[in-house]
Amino acid sequence: MAGIGRVALMQEPVAAVMSVMKAHQIDGTFLIYDLGGGTLDIAIAQSTAGRVSLLSHGGIALCGGRDFDRRVRESIVKPWLTANFDLPEDFSIHPKYRRLMRMAALAVERAKIELSAKDSATISLSEAETQCADECGSEIYIDCDLTRDDFNQLIADCVDKSITAAREAIQKAGLSPFDIERIVFI
C-alpha cells in the first residue's frame, strides 16, 4: 500500500520488553506481567540469540491500579466519611463533593504506595486540602487506616483473575508453567 512491509501490532509494554530482550541478548521464555492503571496485559515471549518471538498475549480490562483505588474508596473511605459527616447518600457523585472525591483518590493512591513498604497506612486529608463542608457546615477531613491485609482482601479477586489470565496465556502459547524461565513485572 505505502511500500511498507507487513507490520505486527502489539501492546506497548510487550514491545518495550521485547526491545530490551533483543538489545541485551537475553535468551529464554518470559511471562510479561504488566499491571497498569486500568488494565492488566500478559504476554509470553521467547528470546533466542537476539530474535524475539511473541508466543501469546492476553489480559483483563478494568483490572489495574485505578480499579484497586476505587475499591478502597468505596469500601473504606466512603463508609468512613458517612460515619463521620452529614453527607447525602449520593455524595460521591454530587457536584458539591467532586473536589473531595478527587482529593480522596489521590490520598488513597498515596496510601497504596505506602503499603508497599509498610503493613498499614493512613488515608488522610486535612480540611484545608478538601476545602469542603458537609450538609451541617462542618469542615470535612479524612483520617482512616488501610492495612495491607485489608487491601489484599479488597483486590483478591483481581489477583486471582490475573493468575488465571497468566495461565491462559501460557496454555495459549502451548507451554506449561515449568517452561517459563523468567517473569518480568512492569
Task: Please provide the spans of the model-predicted regions.
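Oxyanion-binding/catalytic loops of NTP- or PPi-dependent enzymes
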Residues: 1-186
